[in-house]
Amino acid sequence: MTLPSPPMSLLAELTHRCPLSCPYCSNPLELERKAAELDTATWTAVLEQAAELGVLQVHFSGGEPMARPDLVELVSVARRLNLYSNLITSGVLLDEPKLEALDRAGLDHIQLSFQDVTEAGAERIGGLKGAQARKVAAARLIRASGIPMTLNFVVHRENVARIPEMFALARELGAGRVEIAHTQYYGWGLKNREALLPSRDQLEESTRAVEAERAKGGLSVDYVTPDYHADRPKPCMGGWGQRFVNVTPSGRVLPCHAAEIIPDVAFPNVQDVTLSEIWNISPLFNMFRGTDWMPEPCRSCERKERDWGGCRCQAMALTGNAANTDPVCSLSPYHDRVEQAVENNMQPESTLFYRRYT
């Protein structure tokens, strides 16, 4: 039996607790409770198993990972194991003593999320008064510390016109990299698609803004587009079970953070099975790995080893079957569902459903 290549990255979702209430959150609709979270010893074992498996990077995420009092200890474990560590944070819980402790522990990089460039826009999306000022203060602390920093802006219908101002803020705060990431419509994003999905004109405007910023030079810019205006799908996390492994707060192991929407599937847990066994031989990770599972037209497509059939969770959400061709693809028999979603979601005003951790 030929084993798959090891994953490059581990997404360690330490907790679903978060002081923000973003309506596009990538967490599942059913949030895991604090009582179910893995303890420090178990997360340490997960990191050790990840390093042994061949993982190179660990991304500490959430929720808000800074809600975990053992974050510094886990960062130090990652350093001991020579795992590149990235903290994905809202910044609202970050202060100078905490940052100094993370720096001493060996943290390699911080991705700081912003909901908008205006206070009103940030509070409308994040739901936390004063969050924008805290984020700006956090960015200045990170810059002063010398830890490399990426600013992440999630964009959608309400803030997409402010992308140039996002770049201006990034330059002001001394970020080396900026990620302009359109909302991805899974989980909370899918629940709020009617309110958040931009028009094609807005998408094209955002692309022009990104291209103009890249032309200036001096700032590295990552750009993630929404699938709904495309005619070919993106590879799901670089291909299902090929590059990434995700561990939830309670220890469930997923090929991507949205996979739990797929029904009638057993999700293995690091408390019961080693990460190596899960990655190499579990039915879950082999379910859509490679190309043998593909239906037509994917099976005969020249792009099948580039996009790997697209997103299984999107196929599940829009067609009811995770094995179907990603409906974003213009060759998919279900492509009309994406076209209809775009048409239906162009309402001038829609209600936002906020992610609440109660």
From Swiss-Prot:
This enzyme's EC code(s): 1.21.98.4
Annotated residues for binding of [4Fe-4S] cluster: 18, 22, 25
Pfam families: Fer4_12, Radical_SAM, SPASM
Radical SAM core domain ranges (all copies): 4-219
Recorded GO MF terms: 4 iron, 4 sulfur cluster binding; cyclase activity; iron ion binding; oxidoreductase activity; S-adenosyl-L-methionine binding
Catalysed reaction, written as an equation: [PQQ precursor protein] + S-adenosyl-L-methionine = E-Y cross-linked-[PQQ precursor protein] + 5'-deoxyadenosine + L-methionine + H(+)
SUPFAM superfamilies for the chain: Radical SAM enzymes
InterPro entries listed in its UniProt record: 4Fe4S-binding_SPASM_dom (IPR023885), Aldolase_TIM (IPR013785), Elp3/MiaA/NifB-like_rSAM (IPR006638), MoaA_NifB_PqqE_Fe-S-bd_CS (IPR000385), PQQ_synth_PqqE_bac (IPR011843), PqqE-like (IPR017200), Radical_SAM_PqqE_MftC-like (IPR050377), rSAM (IPR007197)
Top-level class of the enzyme under EC nomenclature: oxidoreductase
Biological pathway: Cofactor biosynthesis; pyrroloquinoline quinone biosynthesis
Keyword Transit peptide: no
The family this protein is said to belong to: Belongs to the radical SAM superfamily. PqqE family.
Protein name: PqqA peptide cyclase
Gene behind the chain: pqqE
